[in-house]
Amino acid sequence: PTAPETGRVKRDLQTMDSSIVRLDGHTGRLLGQWHLQDQRLSLRHLAWSPDARTLGIALQAEHDDTTAKDAAPVLALFDGTALRVVPTPEHIAQSIHGYGGSMAATPAGWAVSCPRANGIATYTPQGEWRGLVPLPDVCPLAVHGGALWAGGLGASLQNAQAVAPLAHPHGA
């Protein structure tokens, strides 16, 4: 957590509570709460699967230890009954540095922008690793017509989860 007067200085990380809660919309009563085992994984951006059955959550690692941060996953999935982290292959996770940016879901699966890795981490709808789609300084993700769009430094990608995404250079 940060405070407005400190800018982006992080404080009280030991009090983090990485969880999803379900509240009664009329009374505010707590109906359920699901926690991640690793309390230093911050739940960030959210996207529903196209069938609205699963919630994808981009994660940001807040570990003091850089080794733990570099090994951290960037995607969690919540199916209404369980919250689980989705592993990222170790050799890829080290380049991501535990930082998931934007989040999107398409019929092809999940996407998490990873600007520190200059790419988009992609997963199947079930959460299995697909690959890292290269795009320098990628951050914003959007879905249009079932296809993933991604914005990065110098270009945007159309249908970014395809075998051959279409690049749209900026300023061209």
State the predicted function of each range.
Residues 57-58, 112, 150:
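Residue position within the beta-strands of beta-propeller blades
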Residues 151-172:
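Blade-level signature of beta-propeller repeat domains, shared across WD40, Kelch, NHL, RCC1
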Residues 34-39, 87-96, 131-136:
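Surface loop/turn motifs at the tips and blade-to-blade linkers of beta-strand repeat domains
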Residues 88-125, 138-139:
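Loop/turn-rich, solvent-exposed surfaces of beta-rich toroidal or solenoidal domains
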Residues 10-26, 71-80:
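Beta-propeller blade signature
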Residues 40-47, 95-103, 136-145, 168-172:
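Repeated scaffold domains used in trafficking and secretory/extracellular systems
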Residues 1-16, 58-72:
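Short, conserved, GDST-rich strand-edge loop motifs in beta-rich repeat architectures
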Residues 51-53, 107-108, 145-146:
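Short coil/turn segments that connect the beta-strands within blades of beta-propeller domains
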